[in-house]
């Protein structure tokens, strides 16, 4: 799947963008689940919440030789207007971790995303809930102010 989705390009940034588009286009969103599916299970159903999107995208990037990890934080949602817990992917490109979000489509990652922590998933077992524990310290206590120049 990774070879087909990445296309013929040899440029890692382009591969990541193509893989992100592929996951966004072919996966169906489902309600949040507390279990963390392995990529092999996600490929079979091609459905999941932000955690499955991030895990699959990270796995596809790694299959192309691109170091990647998942990120846990908050994303702005409009209904109701607030920041909600979310997971997306980062790829190591030219020595910098660059964010990609296959649940947001062409919108990508920007000011709508607030990173709290990241993981290679090598130390978490079974439950996606463990990854979201660091967010608990922010709930009900944090405010976000944007200053536009």
Provide a role label for each language-model segment.
Residues 1-48, 56-58, 120-125, 129-149:
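Secondary-structure boundary elements
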Residues 11-18, 52, 56, 65, ...:
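Generic recognition of stable, solvent-exposed alpha-helical segments in well-folded globular domains
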